[in-house]
Amino acid sequence: MGFNIPYTDKKRVVIIGGGFGGLKLAEKLKKSKFQVVLIDKNNYHQFPPLLYQVASSGLEYNEISFPYRKIFQKRKNFYFRLAEVYGVNPKGHTIQTSIGELEYDYLVIAAGTITNFFGNKTIEEQSLPMKTVEEALALRDTLLINLEKATTCTDPDEKQALLNIVVVGGGATGCLLYTSPSPRD
């Protein structure tokens, strides 16, 4: 495998991560003198502020996911590659990825965030985070399965346990999920 990116005399800007920051930078470089390579582990940009809507069945995942190749389909000197980055060699101006090594002139790391459990192992092991489309779908599936089980459950304690939902964290995503209509409404 490899990147299969044509040689050019232009300086190459490699952007790791296609979230808001990476996407905005790629857009700003639209009419620049650079060759731009965007690398992301997903082939789509997701809109995180609406993940709670996917988790609560208000939206489908494709309503908040936008393929990079479609976003940049008419761009010259722009290349998207689906890959995971494993390492950076600043002295050699290269990155190591799941599809090979790539040279760069300028490197921008805009890889996003991960869920921070603040060292709480119980929450880490027992919770369903919601930072990605996949996690929002997993949360939605769990909520719907629990609601279906509760519908046929005859044991009041078991039914209550199935209907209990604990939101950990008071950020925007947790608050929006907590206040959004449930799938049974």
What are these regions (language model features)?
Residues 18, 40-41, 170:
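Cofactor-binding loop segments of dinucleotide-utilizing enzymes, especially the Rossmann-like FAD-
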Residues 3, 28-104:
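N-terminal Rossmann-like dinucleotide/flavin-binding domain of flavoprotein oxidoreductases
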Residues 13-32, 177:
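N-terminal Rossmann-like FAD-binding beta1-loop-alpha1 element of flavoenzymes
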Residues 179-185:
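Conserved small/polar residues in nucleotide/adenosyl-binding loops
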Residues 21, 44, 114, 173:
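Conserved Rossmann-like nucleotide-cofactor binding loop
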Residues 25-26, 48, 118-120, 177-178:
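Short glycine-/acidic-enriched loop or helix-start segments at secondary-structure transitions
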Residues 1-12, 79-166:
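FAD-binding core/adjacent interface of flavoenzyme oxidoreductases
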